[in-house]
Amino acid sequence: MELIEILQALNACHGPSGSEGAVAGVLRTLAAPYVDSCTTDALGNLICHKKGSGPKVLFAAHMDSIGLMVTYIDEKGFLRFGPVGGLSAHEVLGTPVRFANGTRGVVALEGKVEPKDMKLEHLYLDIGARNEAEARTMVQVGDIAVYDTPAFCSGGRIFSPYLDDR
């Protein structure tokens, strides 16, 4: 499997903090041909072991991703959210997102806010719902969205929102 295909498979996983199981599953499958065993501990850590008498090496990386947790659904069907991890209003505005159930949306800005004054509370998720009732058939308060941005190559470089460790 090519590196870009591996990154695309990992990007496709829904893995916000506390829900990294899908990511661990993909990593387990990817690692299986190269290791003797893969186990998951009580905290959800994936531990892959390659037997041998040579020097020991540890590769450590997080599997979770930044998330946006739905905190309120308004009468227009827009979703207010809180951060799961470090979020900046300036960085997340306009970002496509997806929920575990496949619902997709985008981070939008309410009204006219000066860039210097923009905060997370000025943002909302637009999932295309016409009203609150329709939105509630798509997502619930407490559901978490992650970035819905694919890995891709351009100019000999690889781009992905999950290149920090995952």
Which positions does each model-derived feature cover?
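N-terminal hydrophobic/helix-forming segments and targeting peptides
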Residues: 1-166
